[in-house]
Amino acid sequence: FDGIIGAGGGFVQMGDEMLYHKKVSDEDVHRVVDFFETNHYDYYLESNGGLFASKNLIKRLESIIYGDLKNDPEARRKKEEEPSHFITALIENENMYRNDVNKICFLEHESIPFDEIRKQFCDAFQVIECTVPAFGDASGELSVAGVNKHTAIEALINHLGIDQKDTYAYGDGMNDAEMLTFVAHGVAVGNAKEGLKAIADEVCDDIANDGIYKNMKEHGLI
């Protein structure tokens, strides 16, 4: 198998073949963008064509990842010598009303609680809280309703004729919950959210300590 499950289960690609691809409808993209722009959210649209950033997103991410660029020489050094691959991948100044959106990720808003996002969009989206802890407790993502990593893995193993009992998955955030409960061996990494560890079959070492690699060696996968 040489492929990828991307966008939180939004698409499955094997080599050059796209097994399936679930995108956000144009109507729902407009709806979310209008809400986020009106309420001054920092967010980005994830698509197979790139990551498209809202107006002030990169400035805020630089503050989170590097620190105080204006007053701290060490922060400026980090930006110059150790640039974030995530930040450099973001595309600015593009039309956000796109027709190729897989999911939408947003940072925490200082005055709007996460429950308000759930209330606004739960009719059309799967609303997942705090998938990237650095983005804040009230951050999250909006993905196509009914689409997750479980559904993607199920479609893939059915296509390949692989038995579910032979499946393993590793996760760190709550958007991995359905995946870890579906596969036969669901493993949470040591730095995972506590809620994910609670439902995992096993907890391995942290990502920074090569937890996935070591666990795969233990299970004879590599």
Predicted regions and their residues:
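Active-site phosphate-binding/coordination module
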Residues: 1-70
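Conserved acidic, metal-coordinating active-site core of Asp-based
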Residues: 50-168
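Short, polar loop motifs at secondary-structure junctions
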Residues: 9, 110-112, 190-194
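Mg2+-dependent phosphoryl-transfer enzymes with acidic/Ser/Thr/Gly-rich catalytic loops
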Residues: 139-222
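A generic structural signal for well-ordered alpha-helical segments
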Residues: 36, 118-121, 196
